[in-house]
């Protein structure tokens, strides 16, 4: 493609173009699950095995969509809509804020948002884990049928139930968010 790209750009990452004057993009999910093939990622983004670190400061949506492999995608910054939508395996870590519908239709895998999450995080979730380190906005886990959400400062929407975190839950939240176990005790487990 030629010209400028407006954000959010979707579940894509720039690779070196084979055509002068053009930019080339590939699906993030395809790159982490099937490798870069003959393509080279454009710095500062780095792929090491099945771990992708996205640090180019571009806001994306649907990061990790439909991931079905044991990949790890770390976005250093904010993301927009539907992070981890329809994931079955793998992990997406967002160090900043996440837009609406993070973890929507999650069917396995793990989505970790270290910042705030906008409304409808975990909507229609079937299985997997969603961890929100900041403040979740309204309708957390709306119509959730399975899986687990860890958050604080939120209330359960039926059919979900809010439970106190236990030893294993505290360790999981502490590990994923890089916080003390004492701080992790303030979280709730939504099942």
Regions found by a protein language model. Give the residues of each.
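Intrinsically disordered, low-complexity terminal regions
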Residues: 1-63, 70-72, 95, 114, ...
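Beta-strand-rich binding-surface signature
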Residues: 91, 110, 129
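Extended, positively charged loop/linker patches that create polyanion-binding surfaces
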Residues: 79-80, 95-107, 113-119, 124, ...
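Extracellular beta-strand-rich solenoid/capping regions of secreted or surface-exposed proteins
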Residues: 65-67, 84
């Amino acid at each position: 493609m030629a010209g400028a790209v407006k954000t959010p750009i979707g579940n894509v990452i720039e690779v070196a173009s084979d055509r002068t004057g053009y930019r080339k993009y590939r699906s993030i999910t395809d790159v982490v699950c099937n490798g870069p093939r003959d393509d080279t990622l454009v710095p500062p983004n780095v792929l090491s095995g099945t771990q992708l670190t996205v640090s180019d400061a571009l806001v994306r949506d649907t990061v990790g969509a439909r991931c079905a492999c044991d990949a790890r995608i770390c976005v250093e910054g904010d993301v927009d809509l539907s992070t981890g939508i329809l994931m079955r395996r793998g992990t997406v870590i967002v160090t900043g804020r996440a837009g609406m519908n993070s973890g929507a239709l999650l069917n396995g895998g793990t989505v970790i948002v270290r910042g705030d999450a906008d409304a409808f995080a975990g909507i229609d979730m079937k299985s997997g884990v969603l961890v929100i380190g900041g403040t979740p906005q309204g309708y957390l886990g709306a119509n959730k049928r399975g899986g687990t959400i860890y958050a604080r400062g939120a209330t359960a929407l039926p059919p979900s139930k809010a439970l106190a975190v236990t030893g294993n839950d505290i360790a999981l939240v502490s590990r994923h968010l890089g916080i003390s176990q004492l701080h992790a005790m303030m979280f709730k487990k939504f099942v």
